[in-house]
Structure formats: C-alpha cells, structure tokens
Design a protein with these regions (language model features):
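Anionic-ligand binding patches
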Residues: 2-7, 14-203
Length: 203
C-alpha cells in the first residue's frame, strides 16, 4: 500500500538528504536505516538492488527503497567494464579514485557509463527503476567542496555533452542534466505520485 512515510535503506547521509528533498516535494517523510547486507556475487546492478530490497523488507517490514550505483569503464586495462556494480569493494576500498586514474593514464578512449538503480517494496508493490548516463573519465579528480556530492565518482565523471565533471557543475547545469536524462529518484517520484493518486481516488 502506498504510504506517506518511507525508509531509505542506506548510511549515506548526503544521499539521504537528496532523497528527502525530492520526496519532500510530495510530502513524503523519509527516514534512513542502515542494514548490513551479505556480499553480493553476481555483477548485475538490477539483481543486486532488487535482492537487497527484498531482504531489507523481510527484516524491517515497512515500505522502503534501496538505491545502488554502478560504474563501467569500457576500456579499463585487462578488465573492461571495471568496477561494475561493485564500486565500493572493487574500487573505493582498494585502489581508490587515484588508482583508477593511474591505471587509465595511458588510455585515450575513456568512455564510461554511470548507472543507477532504485527499488521500492511495501509488501505488496515491488518496483525497480533504472537510469544510465554515458560519459567519459576525466584525467584528474576535481576536488570540489560540493555538499551534494554523494559519490566520489562525480569528481571524475564527465557526462556526455559536457566538458566538466558532475562535481564541477553548477546547480543550474545539474538541473539541465536531470531534465534531459532523469535519474532514478525522479523516475520513482513520478511513479509514486501517480500511484498515491490512484489510492486516494479509490478511497
């Protein structure tokens, strides 16, 4: 059943604020709850996010959402598509952004893909949203002070059609990017609004 309260399963404070801001426009109250998931094996962002959502609901038993991000560097040396769906374990907790850039320093074709996946489950309704943005990997990391940078990848990801990383973009530029390529949070918010309207009509 569509409710006016949701749990965001994450310990990412900045990402929580983004979710609260977006869903707050619909008067939906969002609180966060951390959950320690077992390590995933399959490198499939859709499956990982969906599995996490079902597992979390079985333990929390309240309407919730789970968000995950995948990053795929097309011509990463000896491992095309690295780091894939395992950004934290394969990249951030190992070689880090500096290691990624070091290993890519002699690669001219720096195409990459940033994917996001959001899953919602309330015990009855189960829905998964996906979005992707093509772009290129920068040669150096932008060390900005953007308070809304919830992933370090924004400091090295240059969206297609732009000449700067996401972290370097102004708020207006980010809004423009979101309009041309809606992220999963926007897709979910639009769906949630429609579903809630249907429930109100039935009442």
């Amino acid at each position: 059943m569509i409710e006016d309260e949701l749990i965001f399963v994450s310990n990412n404070y900045v990402k929580l604020k983004e979710v609260q801001k977006k869903l707050g426009e619909l008067d939906v109250k969002v609180t966060s709850k951390n959950y320690n998931f077992h390590e995933q094996i399959e490198n499939d962002l859709f499956c990982i996010t969906a599995d996490k959502t079902i597992i979390a609901y079985d333990n929390i038993l309240k309407p919730l959402i789970v968000m995950d991000t995948g990053f795929y560097v097309e011509n990463y040396p000896n491992n095309p598509g690295f780091p894939g769906a395992f950004i934290k374990t394969n990249l951030l907790d190992t070689i880090g952004i500096k290691g990624l850039l070091e290993n890519m320093k002699n690669v001219a074709d720096r195409k990459c893909l940033l994917k996001e996946c959001l899953a919602y489950y309330d015990g009855d309704n189960f829905k998964v949203f996906e979005s992707s943005q093509e772009g290129t990997l920068a040669y150096s990391e932008y060390q900005g002070t953007n308070s809304d940078k919830y992933t370090k990848l924004f400091g090295v990801f240059i969206p297609e059609g732009y000449s700067k990383t996401v972290s370097e973009m102004s708020s207006d530029e980010k809004d423009e990017l979101a309009k041309t390529n809606p992220n999963v949070l926007s897709l979910f918010a639009n769906w949630y609004k429609k579903e809630r309207s249907k429930c109100l009509v039935k009442k």
